[in-house]
């Protein structure tokens, strides 16, 4: 029993030996990308991919296989092909900008011709567009006519605006009538201004004279003044008073001037009765402002007393 050795080969069957041999050899692990693992399940085995005879478990994929959608996207995004593809697939669709009324000037036609030449030169490019896009042929004659008509319209409006703002630069045949009407209006305005100035000078002169010295109406010699005198026995004396006219005098001492004028009126008209004296007083009160009424009454009383005293003395 000592010389007998127990071996594993005696216990295991002979069919397992080739498996044990293969277990000792390391398997070759091929690192595939993540996107290829997902595509291998869905992809059908092609006739081009052939398995090698000496390996029953390993499969090698051919590089010339069809590209999937994911790979094509990655290749499109690659920096080498991205610029080329984007430039080739860029849509060259030209749409005319709406004309703005605020940008109307003399240099507008030049800029339009330059932009039009650049557009016509670039119109030979290939256009890749969808059904919703609006494609405009810049070489079309109708389009050119429309654009040039619009530009001429803007030029005409510009000229009209300038003519309305500046009447001197216009060459319209009716400008003479406009000037004549303006001259007439200017003459009328000048006449109105002169009238107003004349009226202002008259009013101001009257105001200045009244401000310098108070004016007193001393004699009532105007028949237009409506005086309500009491009827006296001597109608001739009343008519003489009413037919007289008023004299306006600027005085420094109004009481003295009133006294002198009253004495003069009494002497000229030969006023002796009380009714005539009352009529004279009414004339002075109506012709002079209220400021002098108290002074007129005071002076009148003094003159009347003097007249009475003189009549008694003469008798």
Swiss-Prot record:
Residues 201-212 have a biased composition (Polar residues). Keywords: Nucleus, Repressor, Transcription, Transcription regulation. It comes from the Eukaryota. InterPro entries: DNA_bnd_dom_ovate, Ovate, Ovate_C. PROSITE patterns: OVATE. Residues 159-172 have a biased composition (Basic and acidic residues). Residues 247-306 form the OVATE domain. Disruption phenotype: Moderate irregular xylem, but normal plant morphology. It is found in: Nucleus. One of its GO terms (biological process) is regulation of secondary cell wall biogenesis. It holds the Pfam family Ovate. Expressed in root vascular cylinder, root tips, xylem of stems, flower buds and siliques. Residues 27-54, 159-238 are annotated as: Disordered. GO terms for molecular function: DNA binding. PANTHER family: TRANSCRIPTION REPRESSOR OFP4, TRANSCRIPTION REPRESSOR OFP7-RELATED. Plants over-expressing OFP4 show kidney-shaped cotyledons, round and curled leaves, small rosette size, late flowering, reduced fertilization and round seeds. NCBIfam families: A_thal_3678 (TIGR01568). Interacts with BLH1, BLH2, BLH3, BLH6, BLH10, KNAT1, KNAT3, KNAT4, KNAT5, KNAT6 and KNAT7. Transcriptional repressor that regulates multiple aspects of plant growth and development through the regulation of BEL1-LIKE (BLH) and KNOX TALE (KNAT) homeodomain transcription factors. Forms a transcription repression complex with KNAT7 which regulates secondary cell wall formation. This is Transcription repressor OFP4. The gene is OFP4.
């Amino acid at each position: 029993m000592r010389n007998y050795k127990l071996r594993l080969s005696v216990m295991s069957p002979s069919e397992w030996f080739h498996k044990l041999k293969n277990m000792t050899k390391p398997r070759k692990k091929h690192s595939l990308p993540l996107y290829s693992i997902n595509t291998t399940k869905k992809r059908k085995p092609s006739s081009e991919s052939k398995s090698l005879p000496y390996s029953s478990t390993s499969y090698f994929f051919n590089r010339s296989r069809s590209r999937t959608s994911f790979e094509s996207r990655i290749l499109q995004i690659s920096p080498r092909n991205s610029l080329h593809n984007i430039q080739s697939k860029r849509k060259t669709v030209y749409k005319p900008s709406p004309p703005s009324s605020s940008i109307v000037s003399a240099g507008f036609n030049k800029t339009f011709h330059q932009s039009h030449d650049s557009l016509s030169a670039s119109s030979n490019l290939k256009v890749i567009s969808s059904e919703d896009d609006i494609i405009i042929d810049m070489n079309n004659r109708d389009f050119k006519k429309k654009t040039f008509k619009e530009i001429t319209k803007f030029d005409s409006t510009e000229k009209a605006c300038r003519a309305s703002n500046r009447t001197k630069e216009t060459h319209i045949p009716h400008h003479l009538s406009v000037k004549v009407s303006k001259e007439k209006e200017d003459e009328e305005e000048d006449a109105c201004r002169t009238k107003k100035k004349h009226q202002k000078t008259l009013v101001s002169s009257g105001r200045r004279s009244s401000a310098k010295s108070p004016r007193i109406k001393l004699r009532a010699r105007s028949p237009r003044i409506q005086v309500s005198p009491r009827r006296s026995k001597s109608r001739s004396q009343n008519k003489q008073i009413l037919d007289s006219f008023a004299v306006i005098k600027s005085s420094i001492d109004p009481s003295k001037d009133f006294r002198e004028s009253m004495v003069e009126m009494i002497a000229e008209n030969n006023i002796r009765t009380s009714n005539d004296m009352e009529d004279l007083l009414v004339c002075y009160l109506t012709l002079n402002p209220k400021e002098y009424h108290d002074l007129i009454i005071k002076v009148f009383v003094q003159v009347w007393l003097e007249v009475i005293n003189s009549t008694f003395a003469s008798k």
